Amino acid sequence: MGILKKENEKSAKPKYNMWQCSAYMISLAWREKEKKILLLCLLQVFLAVMSNLVNLYVAPSVLSVVERGASITELLTMVLIFVILIMFCSAATSYVNSNTLYGRVTVRLALISDINKKACTTSYPNLFEEKFTKLSAKCQQATSNNQEATEAIWDTLTSLAQNCIGFVIYLFLLVSVDIWLMLVILLTSLIGYFVNKKLTGYGYRHREEEGGISRKLWYQIRQAQNYTAAKDIRIFGMKPWMEEITDKAMTAYTAFHRRAHNVYIWGSILDLVLTILRNGLAYFVLIDLVLSGNLSVSAFLLYFSAVGGFTAWVTGILGSMTTLYRQSLDISIIREFLEYPEPFRFQDGEKLSDATGTQHEIKLENVFFKYPGADDYTLEDINLTIHPGEKVAVVGLNGAGKTTLVKLICGFFDPTHGKVLLDGKDIREFNRQDYYAMFSAVFQNFSLLAETVAVNVAQSEENYDMERIKDCAEKSGLTAKISSLKDGYQTYLNRTVYEDGAELSGGETQKLMLARALYKKAPFIILDEPTAALDPIAEADMYSKYNEMTKGCASVYISHRLASTRFCDRILLIGNHKIVEEGTHEELLKLSGEYARLFEIQSKYYREEDVCEKGQETAHLA
């Protein structure tokens, strides 16, 4: 089955053909109000054809004047006319070409924006789909520079149009010579085109393989340049190991493109053979006409040039079609990515504001969950209700499923079996963006914007409440640090982007994330190990303010430190993929179960550590 699936993927046709992809790019230019791209392309076509015709007729026309024995004045006039025409075409072409770049870049950037929007707003489970991640990597490659399909397609369409017009003009010019000659030229050209089309489809048929190789390579390159990995690379001597892995990825990448090149080269060889046959036959016919006295010298020169030009037009059409086909493969992939199915409901979901009041209750009913592609369940038979304003703590060993439970509550995943209900209604019925708006969170992995402190707290560049930002910073314990910064709340973060940007420590960043979570004022607040990077004093300060910080909202607090959960209304202990114990801190201790055992182990550790510190202090005083 695996082999059959792989073969089907290789032979799969692109979802959109090259004409649909071309129409898509034109509509995108129209949407972005870059209609001048089309006008400039038409001007390029007109000037290219005009320039070619001028160059075609210049030598035969001058020779014809000489053959007729015309005056020197007529000859010079003829030469001057052609010089002016050539200069005009050259100058106009340069002017038009210099004005085409901006609009094309704008359209490509708009496409990049669409791709980024899809990546940022897609249903969370899609991020774990291999097909989605491969399409995403291909989209990044297809929009990475000016030579990629999303921008180069305009040159291809322009080239195709001018080649088609030139072909028609030259066809009428040469049809009087020999109709069979024209048919032979067309036939050999079509054979070359269809064979080339089949060969150049190799890249698309093997796009899954190429996508996987590219993702590995670019991951290694990004990791080598990753600021956060710099310390690990140096301390653990990872440089040789990373170089070895990168070399393997580059070798695989090079090998793939070498195989593709070996396929493409056969198309080039066939083109060469067919071109020799076409030109040889055409020149034989023309020379025979001259020798039989049916063509003048100037006419021979015209047709001789026209045959070469006609062949160039035909080759140009086929080359442009082949290039357009190859570029359309990338654009088709981009469209597939943008249209990737969404398991969650967004715009078509029920508006949350219309369905619920201000007080909310979340309930998990018989929830089972396993990650995409996994065989075993991470969580089994979870039944949980979070009441309005309730403070719930979730504890358990590493890998117990605490963070997974939070992902289900937040709606990042839907249960494999069972339901997550908001105020008694399945969250799958709601607009998922509206549902996300119900939550504020501090996750284990967080990200800072290369923006000011104020913008990072408010998550908005405009219309933010400065007093509320300061209040949230005070509650999270970040006020002193912000006061020490050069521009206070207007200080930019991230030294990679801003030379004078501030760099926060892990604990300071965690406080900033807490301030951001408080600023949102959501009905539910999720705190996943919010004190992991804090020192004991800052941690104790956060505990003392917890009730104040979470006033008016329900909260879910995840922690490994069992002593830190005393201020919660209810504690859930996750173990063996289930909720094994539930109650207040005191109730769970009285049960003398797993929670009490873990608490005793942690308490013993802290007592021993305290005794050790006191012993060292006594020895120091002695």
Question: Which stretches of residues belong to each language-model region?
Answer:
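Extended non-transmembrane interhelical loops and adjacent amphipathic helices
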Residues: M1-A23, V105-E151, I213-F256, S328-P341, ...
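Membrane-integrated ABC transporters
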Residues: M1-S51, I72-T77, V96, T100, ...
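C-terminal portion of ABC ATPase nucleotide-binding domains
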Residues: I3, G488, S544, G552, ...
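Transmembrane helix-loop-helix hairpins at lipid-water interfaces of multipass membrane proteins
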Residues: L38-A92, F172-G203, L277-F284, D288-S298, ...
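ABC-fold ATPase nucleotide-binding domain signature/coupling loops
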Residues: S136, Y377, P415, L421, ...
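Cytosolic ends of transmembrane helices, especially the final helix of ABC transmembrane type-1 domains
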Residues: M238, A282, Y303-E339
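Helix-to-loop junction immediately C-terminal to a conserved catalytic motif
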Residues: C410
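ABC ATPase nucleotide-binding domain helical subdomain, centered on the C-loop/LSGGQ "ABC signature"
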Residues: K419-L421, Y436, A454-E499, Y543-S544, ...
